[in-house]
Amino acid sequence: MAAIDIGDVNVVSRSYGLSAGYLHILKTNPANLSGKITQVQLYAKTGYSMANVRVGTCYIVSGTNYSSRDYEDIGTVAAGAVRTFTVDLDVEAGDVLCCTFTSGQLCYVEPGGAGIRYIFGGSIPFTNEETSNASTTGDLSFGGTGATIEVSGTNAIFFGMNF
């Protein structure tokens, strides 16, 4: 299995915080491979714990329209430090991370990344939703890692005559 990374690879405290009530899409560091994201890290701004956090993977449909691929609820992200969560998210090469939360702030920096898009009042899952530009160079303190999935011949189905 090969390693997958997506989003911010250096999740740290940042000077600014993005507010709740939006679906945030992080364009920085799209997934390098297809497989499963098994861990995500987030940094809630000091003093602003995040509640009802949902994280996911998403992809560009066309232009500025995105659709979600997979998501998981992770609950509360306590403020003031990197928090790590175990997840099971499907990901395809080129996908990016997205998240929603009902209160608190997610750390971000400007400039420092490939940009942040948003949907006001958006939720996950979503299909072919038009997004707005929050920042062309921003980066969120939000990243993930995982691995490719290898199919073993033991559980595979083969068609044809030559085995």
Regions found by a protein language model. Name each.
Residues 74-81:
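Short proline/glycine- and polar residue-rich coil/turn motifs
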